[in-house]
Amino acid sequence: MLTPIAYGLAIVLIALFAFIGLRFLVVPRPAAAGYGVAAKEDGDPAYLTIKGQRDFTLSLVGAALLAFSNAHAVGWYMLVVAIIPLTDTLIVLRHGGTKAVAFGIHFATAVAVLISAALMFAV
């Protein structure tokens, strides 16, 4: 019973990582606004593209681990990946974003990723 839940949550989260990466690649400025810190109109869009390609590539690593590795490897991946939304929480708070976005999106995502890691270690 626990295995489908563990893998299901991991699949959903990895798909979310891919979506975020693709969004930053396709529509970078709206993606930045959704992130919680709006991009400056005169700012260099290369940094948004960098974020997009890194998030998307990281999702491919997770997908490869899901497909070709074991649950513990995916658990370690999720544990390490949880650092990203945790630091995103701090970035949003330090750069003028709202607490609602910082905690409601980024911190909540970190909690979900940590739960996923725990579930993957448990199966």
Sequence positions of predicted segments:
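Helix-coil boundary and interhelical linker segments in multi-pass alpha-helical membrane proteins
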Residues: 1-9, 64-74, 117-123
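Hydrophobic alpha-helical transmembrane segments
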Residues: 1-7, 21-26, 47-60
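Residues within membrane-spanning alpha-helices of integral membrane proteins
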Residues: 7-17, 52-55, 75-85, 110
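N-terminal signal-anchor/start-transfer transmembrane helix
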Residues: 10-32
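Cytosolic, membrane-interface loops and tails of multi-pass inner-membrane proteins
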Residues: 26-45
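Small-residue-rich segments of transmembrane alpha-helices in multi-pass membrane proteins
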Residues: 42, 105-120
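Core segments of alpha-helical transmembrane spans in multipass integral membrane proteins
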Residues: 43-67, 80-83, 87
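Membrane-helix boundary connector in multi-pass membrane proteins
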Residues: 68-69, 87-103, 121-123
